[in-house]
Amino acid sequence: MKQSLGLLEVSGLALAISCADVMAKAASITLVGLEKTNGSGWMVIKIIGDVASVQAAISTGVSFADQRDGLVAHKVISRPGDGILSHSVTPESESEPAPAPTPVVPHEEIPEDHAAPEAPQDAELISCNLCLDPACPRQKGEPRSLCLHSGKRGEA
């Protein structure tokens, strides 16, 4: 099946991302990319797919951008020439190299004698986030007047 190319030009990055999201949800298309144009903060959204899907996605994106007063231009090229489609779509093999395999290192068990030291058990929990005093009865979220050190702020 022949791929078609859809272009939607909107003003602003946030609107471009929102339009791309709406178009991807509306039809079975592939988002080729978002490209910043020169001046005025315009962005071009490039999509590919079969003709009906691209037309449906572009019409959805046009109505979405028009409601938000950000539509600049739109175009669906049903049967683009070989040079246009190959020039606007970069192959994935060039853009994303295959990840290098990671070596598998066997996990050795650490004897209990050499285990990492645990936190001391006698450490008291700090409940007041104002004075950080473990003896303070105030809990986080309670009024500041319940803090033991409520009148002593700013003193060293």
Curated annotation (Swiss-Prot):
Free-text biotechnology note from the record: Artificial BMCs can be made in E.coli by expressing pduA-pduB/B'-pduJ-pduK-pduN-pduU-pduT (in this order); pduT and pduU are optional, while pduA, pduB/B', pduJ, pduK and pduN are essential. A construct with the reversed gene order does not make BMCs. Ethanogenic BMCs can be made in E.coli by targeting pyruvate decarboxylase (pdc) and alcohol dehydrogenase (adh) to them. PduP(1-18)-Pdc and PduD(1-18)-Adh strains targeted to the BMC (PduA, PduB, PduJ, PduK, PduN, PduU) make significantly more ethanol than strains where Pdc and Adh are not targeted to the BMC.
Disulfide bonds: none
Location of the BMC domain: 4-89
Cofactor requirement: Fe cation
Superkingdom field: Bacteria
GO terms for biological process, alphabetical: propanediol catabolic process
Record keywords: Bacterial microcompartment, Iron
Gene3D superfamilies given in the database record: 3.30.70.1710
Metabolic or biological pathway: Polyol metabolism; 1,2-propanediol degradation
Function text: A minor shell protein of the bacterial microcompartment (BMC) dedicated to 1,2-propanediol (1,2-PD) degradation. Expression of a cosmid containing the full 21-gene pdu operon in E.coli allows E.coli to grow on 1,2-propanediol (1,2-PD) with the appearance of bacterial microcompartments (BMC) in its cytoplasm. Overexpression of this protein leads to the appearance of a single large aggregate complex in the cytoplasm.
Subunit-level organization: Interacts with shell protein PduA and assembly protein PduM. Interacts with PduP, probably with its first 18 residues.
GO annotation, cellular component aspect: bacterial microcompartment
Cofactor note: Might bind an [Fe-S] cluster in vivo.
Keyword Repeat set for record: no
Keyword Iron: yes
Bias (Basic and acidic residues) ranges: 106-116
Homology family: Belongs to the bacterial microcompartments protein family.
Protein name as annotated: Bacterial microcompartment shell protein PduK
CDD domains: BMC_PduK
Annotated stretches, region: Disordered: 81-119
Principal location listed in the UniProt entry: other
PANTHER family to which the protein is assigned, alphabetical: BACTERIAL MICROCOMPARTMENT SHELL PROTEIN PDUJ (PTHR33941:SF11), PROPANEDIOL UTILIZATION PROTEIN PDUA (PTHR33941)
Cell compartment(s), UniProt: Bacterial microcompartment
